[in-house]
Amino acid sequence: MKIFLCIIAVVSLQGVVAFHVEREYAWKNITYEGIDPASYNIENSIPTAFAHDAASKKIFITVPRRNQIPFTLTELDTTKHPERSPPLSKFPGSDKLISVYQPVIDECRRLWIADVGQVEYKGDEQKYPKQKAAIIAYDLTKDNYPEIDRYEIPNNVAGNSLGFGGFAVDVTNPKEGCGNTFVYITNFEDNTLIVYDQEKKDSWKISHGSFKPEHDSTLSHNGEQYKYRVGIFGIALGDRDPEGNRPAYYIAGSSTKLFEISTKILKQKGAKFDPVNLGNRGPHSEAIALAYDPKTKVIFFAEADSRQISCWNIQKPLNHKNTDVIYASSKFIFGTDISVDSESQLWFLSNGQPPIDNLKLTFDKPHIRLMRVDTAKAIRRTKCEVKRVKP
């Protein structure tokens, strides 16, 4: 998702709302296990996203390919490395990957990635020749994570793959098997949503006005203001109905509105796309990442301009009065991913590197942080907590 993936700002006043958050990891710079630091560029080692496998206690972290980056897909064994600044290990079987922005783990413990098939810089065209973007799945239940699915996205569907944003994996009925699966990938540059039908090995793209940016958004950093304008970026899936369909919640990066569409529509190639505008989260609440927690019925947003992680309970109307803040810290700079794992733990990552030209970085203090908080604790005593009425 280009360097713009670094734009999710989660910077706020230190200690304002962070009562239940535990800082899991903090790095001054990324190191790689078994690799001499002199052989790679630490300034280019910018993690953008992750996926936590609760069963194995491993975290899979993506580092988009830039000059002198050894691995674009890595893993971190949290049992083996309990320290605060552990090295990242190479993901098995990832030698041929070009550049990966985000990993997702589904209910069948498959790790899904979208390899964009090209690099964002000049000079390594022979080493990393441009190829078709591909959706790839690995089996986390087996040793060395064998590749179990690969699909090359046609160019007319993928569009500019450097604009790939968030994506979601939709297993229709996990209790009956994992075969009937769909993948939804946003493209914030082309303002499209890509749908992959794993069973039929087919894909298509959807365009809609709600995917487009509504306005220029503003990012403030060190007293300066920077403008950006992006379309559909974040997508998250809600609860299944008896037929296995779910609401798909999505946001454009330069918009404060939240939209919903049933996956029943997404799964039908050529179906009429008629989303529901759920409401407006309020001024300066732009976000490009969101995550849904089925346990609490809450959607969490990593906001940009307001520099906070906010929440909204889907059981309430969506408006500014029904949203709240669950985390804010001046040290959590430029969050790049947010997700809820299978144990209802909310995780969010910041890499401390905004997409600003000629940005000068210092490596004397940790600027890359991975945080974790229990979702129920995070919303306690906020507007997002809906207490059950005892019969």
UniProtKB/Swiss-Prot annotation:
UniProt xrefs under InterPro entries: 6-blade_b-propeller_TolB-like, Royal_jelly/protein_yellow
GO cellular component annotations of the record: extracellular region
Sites where a glycan is attached: 29
Tissue: Female salivary gland (at protein level).
Chief localisation class: secreted
Any Pfam family: MRJP
Superkingdom, natural source: Eukaryota
Function, as annotated: Probably modulates blood feeding of sand flies on vertebrate species by binding and sequestering different mediators involved in the host response. Binds biogenic amines. Binds serotonin and dopamine with high affinity. Binds adrenaline, octopamine and adrenaline with medium affinity. Binds histamine with low affinity.
Protein's UniProt name: Yellow-related salivary protein ASP4
Organism in which the protein naturally occurs: Phlebotomus orientalis (Phlebotomine sand fly)
